Amino acid sequence: MIRFTTAGESHGEGLFVIIEGIPAGLTINSEDIDLELARRQKGYGRGQRMCIETDTVKVFSGMRHTVSLGSPIAMYIANKDFKNWTKIMSPTSVDSEVTPLLRPRPGHADLPGFMKYGVNDFRDILERASARETAARVAAGAVCKALLKEFEISIVSYTSQIGDVTADISSVEECKIWHDAEISCVRCPDAKASEKMIQLIKKAGEKGDTLGGKVVVVTKNVPAGLGSHTQWDLKLDGRLAQSLISIQAVKAVEFGAGTKLASLLGALSHDEIFYDVTRGFYRDTNRAGGIEGGMSNGEPIVVTCTMKAIPSLANPLHSVNLATKETAEAEAIRSDVCAVPAVGIVAEAAIAVELAKALKEKFGGDSLKDMKKNVNIYKERIKAL
């Protein structure tokens, strides 16, 4: 089974991730992981910290000469900003007192964590709750992307909305969508919408405010049959949704036509089935988003994630001082104005991990060679139907 765990605080010395279950024999280049980390850091509206950090990964175990061994892969990403936080974030005792944070931000983990863990300073909560943790997830996702690539499965994403500005890609060729998204500073393939998004982010920043939005993630060439209908926790869409909704500030996840299906009749809600000797079973529409009955159906898996506006505002909201219980402004903590473009990259990583996990559960194999053999046998059986 493929699984990963992360450790590290936002302003601590660094982030750690250990991923288990990757089959032996997979080539993983650290440069490819660094590329994914760099994609996560880009985007108009990111905060000053992105000028400090240049994330790169260091692999400590589980690989030899760029090839996986089948044992746990341990990776480390240094926080270059730690030099400015050594006293505040020291894991050992310090000589002088550190001023506690006591004015929780609405929408963040500050107050719930303060109550749950009984701390005296909610920095103990926010440091781990921070979206900085997603850098470790992106590293794990990059490893899983390398595995999926061996089976010609690819994951791409774009920004479809920021604030009240929505992209129109109805007239854009599919291959151009992904190209234009990568060269846009907000990862939006609609040039006109992209410029409006930039202006909107600029205005929000000037007001000390933040913005949310939506990203669309598409996974191509997923074989039919990943996931299962047999138990609630084996359903592929359920597993993907849990992974995606766990991303900081993501508040909704939709598959295919998503919430639009609420207003459609059944005849317009589902994807009719066709058959061709060359293509096999196929659909002319993809309202299901590539998953039916908790299983992949062979069509592209299409997911939309909605991200709320970041709760760290330069112009803080109303709050309460936890020590005095008096009215106060929430803590003003350095943050992004808009991180929607980055969420697309984190969502790609989350999906990569879950699909790699489902792929290995379906086809097994301690080595990549065995896994490929099993996949080929399965594809031949499907082709013969």
UniProtKB/Swiss-Prot annotation:
Pathway, per record: Metabolic intermediate biosynthesis; chorismate biosynthesis; chorismate from D-erythrose 4-phosphate and phosphoenolpyruvate: step 7/7
Residues noted as binding FMN in the record, renumbered to the chain: R128, A129, S130, Q248, A249, G293, K308, A309, I310, P311, S312, R334
A GO molecular function held by the record: chorismate synthase activity
Keywords per UniProt: Amino-acid biosynthesis, Aromatic amino acid biosynthesis, FAD, Flavoprotein, FMN, Lyase, NADP
A GO term from the CC aspect: cytosol
Cofactor binding remark: Reduced FMN (FMNH(2)).
Enzyme class, first EC level, given as a word: lyase
Binding site for NADP(+): R40, R46
Needed co-factor(s): FMNH2
UniProt superkingdom: Bacteria
Listed InterPro entries: Chorismate_synth, Chorismate_synth_AroC_sf, Chorismate_synthase_CS
Record carries keyword Amino-acid biosynthesis: yes
GO terms classed as biological process: amino acid biosynthetic process; aromatic amino acid family biosynthetic process; chorismate biosynthetic process
E.C. numbers: 4.2.3.5
Catalytic activity: 5-O-(1-carboxyvinyl)-3-phosphoshikimate = chorismate + phosphate
Subunit structure: Homotetramer.
Family matches, as PANTHER family: CHORISMATE SYNTHASE
Entry function: This reaction introduces a second double bond into the aromatic ring system.
Family: Belongs to the chorismate synthase family.
Protein's name in the database: Chorismate synthase
Organism: Endomicrobium trichonymphae
Gene responsible for this protein: aroC
